[in-house]
């Protein structure tokens, strides 16, 4: 009986090792069709707009590029790494005092370049076709605001830490995967989140490098409520892209 139990344990460990990837690299690039909405009311003149007044989004769609890469390694103590980039474009109007100059419905452009640095751990690694990752996202946002009517331009960089959760399910006997990830932080009054859900299809005719297609929906929300700033801005829409798995 002892030999049988030992054999079963060894077989289970070997099966788990066979199902888990010791090392893996994945990357993707595509376009996100963004629909912005909301407004920003502030008396904080130290921000990117240096504004005592209100900015309101014109809610005009735009297509912006995104890129991501996932690096998984076999060292248990060290976290795996996921890196992401996306740009966000928002056009609207500003009313108030900007850098000491009074404006009314002044056309305003805000561009945000986002770099996400995500160390994470595999809690489940394709165990029963399910993957679960937990980690921390450091979202670096480089913002630039431009009001052409008063020849005003300003930029700012902030870092937002968020909890990162990703789950994935491989549909058996197909090359289809369903995946979602959430980046989230709140202090009760203010909340920031970045949520994605997608379906992808892997083309497995190449053994070493496997191309894939992904289609999904993404929503970012910035709901800030403090003494001098009330922000309610949202960016959402469908995205699609190409992937490579090594």
Model-derived segments and their meaning:
Residues 37-57, 89-110, 140-156, 188, ...:
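Flexible, solvent-exposed loop segments that connect beta-strands
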Residues 29-35, 85-89, 123, 138-144, ...:
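Transmembrane beta-strands of outer-membrane beta-barrel pores
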Residues 1-24:
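Cleavable N-terminal export/targeting peptides
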Residues 31, 234-246:
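Outer-membrane beta-barrel "beta-signal"
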Residues 19-87:
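Short glycine/proline- and aromatic-enriched beta-strand/turn motifs that initiate or cap beta-hairpins
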Residues 25-29, 69, 81-83, 119, ...:
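Membrane-embedded beta-strand positions of outer-membrane beta-barrel proteins
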Residues 23, 61-65, 111-115, 130, ...:
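Residues that define the transmembrane beta-barrel architecture of outer-membrane proteins
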Residues 70-149, 158-176, 203-205:
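Gram-negative (and chloroplast) outer-membrane scaffold detector with strong preference
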